[in-house]
């Protein structure tokens, strides 16, 4: 299962700035539009899960809500307009026994407790250079409740470090996160500016 990108859709529909303004000026309109979008994603994924059965394990929910410093919005806005949609999507995934992976680039640190309470099992992509998203902080504060996918920095380290340094970084991350890490780049894809040798070094270190 995949996506449920209702936040992105709302930004496209209203325009991002207008969307955030309407959270204050026309909250009932924002709620109504969000509910219709989430209705669609809940129904679409419910049908997909019903037909697909046990052919896959993970429901990936994708919504980029963040900068490298914090949320695009206030915590109150997140809990009022975004979190209820997440909970509905998570509920349909759990109904079919799926593991819930949430994707959101940037510093999602401030709302991780809300996501854990909502039922998120895996956090992706662990943007390593974003505020409070270092491995030590995440493992210490949330390692008992979450698995992590990502963490190998694609903004600097994978681009500029040597393969030997990348190997050491992967081994360090594995040590910090223990068994709760799926080794991956810190974004959802590996960009062309990353040397192939470093990609190979990351993959090999993950298998050691």
Predicted regions and their residues:
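Active-site loop segments of alpha/beta catalytic cores
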Residues: 1-208
């Amino acid at each position: 299962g995949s996506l449920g990108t209702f936040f992105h859709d709302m930004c496209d529909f209203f325009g991002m700035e207008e969307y955030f303004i309407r959270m204050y000026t026309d909250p009932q309109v924002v709620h109504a539009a969000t509910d219709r979008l989430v209705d669609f994603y809940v129904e679409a994924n419910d049908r997909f899960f019903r037909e697909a059965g046990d052919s896959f394990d993970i429901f990936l929910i994708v919504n980029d809500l963040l900068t490298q410093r914090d949320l695009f919005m206030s915590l109150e806005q997140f809990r009022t307009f975004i979190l209820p949609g997440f909970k509905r999507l998570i509920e349909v995934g759990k109904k079919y026994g799926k593991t819930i992976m949430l994707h959101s680039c940037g510093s999602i640190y401030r709302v991780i407790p809300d996501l854990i309470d909502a039922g998120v099992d895996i956090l992706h992509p662990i943007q390593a250079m974003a505020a409070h998203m270092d491995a030590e902080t995440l493992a210490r504060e949330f390692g008992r409740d979450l698995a992590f996918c990502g963490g190998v920095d694609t903004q600097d380290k994978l681009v500029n470090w040597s393969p030997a340094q990348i190997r050491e970084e992967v081994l360090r991350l594995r040590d910090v996160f223990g068994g709760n890490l799926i080794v991956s780049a810190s974004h959802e894809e590996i960009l062309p500016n990353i040397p192939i040798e470093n990609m190979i070094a990351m993959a090999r270190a993950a298998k050691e």
